């Protein structure tokens, strides 16, 4: 088993020695990671770390196309998927029993695993449409909100309502929606995905697009109404941007079924968290997949294996009541 680390030498040696002595008898021989639709950041990022963990731990594993964070919470809660990815908003709704996939079911068997990145909310239109601001979006515009049950589909329609936009709702995978935008079947796509969003990057290659930022007033309204934070999409993210674009964002976390073996989850976390350069090679959004961002989780209980890793390697002060089983 290989564990690449960028931590202190003593931590590396201790971790490597412990890894060799781990009892793997109760580990699964294979696993899946619930991601989202093809063409989105979740699929690229999730498939990447799934393959990495499988390779490093000598298991069979990979990413699975899903409807995104809401469905991932359900899949991981039931154990149909060992791992998944979610944003803090859908996670909170799922714990409260308001996940639309299974209303009334409190999905408490999905535990926090590691921090991923922030998901900015951004709007894209064809340059030929003349839509350059949210206020330019015409009444009755056909807006693609991503896969049903995704973070974008859950929150962006409510955000558009808050900003006074009248629209016709459309759902689909990001790649498919990008094609519909290019073909004139959609007026706007409302993206909530880690940047750069593959579908947006692909659109930039094929046509001229406008990546629309929120005004200060629009951003303030969203910050007041939703569980989001201020975020700027860096101008270097897309060739279209000439300056940073004002946005809002939610944090994403990898999740694990709470009953998975502690040593298995701890080893998987080590593979992902111990080499950020390798993770950035999977997707640029992984620049935020850093151990110190463990504190961005204020919603989900931690898997005991993940909590142990962050306590040992990131000096994480995770309270006992935030660790599953305590």
Across the structure, where does each feature detected by a protein language model lie?
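N-terminal (or domain-start) structured segment
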Residues: 20-93
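Ligand-binding clefts/hinges and TM-proximal coupling segments of bilobed small-molecule sensing domains
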Residues: 139-155, 227-298
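Bilobed "Venus flytrap"/periplasmic-binding protein-like clamshell domains
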Residues: 28-56, 60-61, 119-183, 292, ...
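Gram-negative bacterial Sec-dependent N-terminal signal peptides
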Residues: 1-19
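An extracytoplasmic/periplasmic, membrane-proximal ligand-sensing/linker region
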Residues: 28-29, 176, 182-183, 193, ...
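Short beta-strand-centered segments that line the small-molecule binding cleft or hinge
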Residues: 92-98, 109-115
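Extracytoplasmic
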Residues: 28, 58, 68-71, 78, ...
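Pocket-lining segment of extracytoplasmic ligand-binding domains
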Residues: 88-90, 97-103, 129, 165-260
């Amino acid at each position: 088993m290989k564990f690449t680390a960028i931590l202190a030498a003593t931590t590396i040696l201790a971790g490597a020695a412990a890894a060799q002595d781990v009892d793997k008898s109760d580990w699964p021989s294979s696993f899946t990671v619930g991601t989202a639709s093809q063409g989105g950041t979740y699929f690229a990022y999730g498939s990447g770390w799934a393959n990495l963990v499988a390779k490093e731990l000598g298991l069979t594993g990979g990413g699975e196309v899903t409807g995104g964070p809401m469905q991932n919470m359900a899949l991981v809660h039931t154990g149909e998927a060992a791992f998944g990815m979610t944003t803090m908003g859908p996670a909170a709704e799922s714990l409260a029993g308001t996940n639309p996939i299974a209303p009334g079911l409190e999905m408490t068997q999905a535990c926090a695993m590691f921090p991923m990145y922030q998901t900015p909310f951004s709007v894209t239109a064809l340059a030929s449409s003349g839509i350059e601001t949210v206020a330019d979006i015409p009444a009755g515009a056909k807006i693609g909100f991503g896969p049903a049950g995704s973070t974008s589909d859950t929150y962006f329609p409510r955000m558009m309502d808050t900003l006074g936009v009248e629209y016709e709702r459309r759902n689909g995978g990001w790649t498919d929606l990008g094609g519909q935008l290019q073909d004139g079947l959609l007026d706007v796509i409302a993206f909530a995905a880690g940047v750069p969003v593959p579908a947006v990057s692909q659109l930039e290659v094929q046509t001229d697009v406008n990546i629309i930022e929120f005004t200060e007033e629009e951003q303030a309204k969203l910050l007041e109404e939703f569980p989001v934070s201020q975020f700027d999409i860096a101008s270097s993210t897309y060739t279209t941007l000439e300056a940073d674009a004002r946005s809002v964002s939610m944090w994403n976390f990898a999740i694990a079924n709470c009953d998975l073996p502690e040593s298995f989850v701890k080893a998987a976390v080590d593979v992902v968290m111990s080499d950020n350069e390798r993770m950035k090679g999977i997707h640029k959004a992984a620049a935020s997949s850093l151990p110190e961002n463990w504190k961005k989780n204020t919603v989900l209980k931690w898997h005991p294996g993940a909590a142990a890793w962050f306590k040992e390697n990131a000096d994480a002060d995770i309270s006992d009541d935030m660790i599953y089983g305590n």
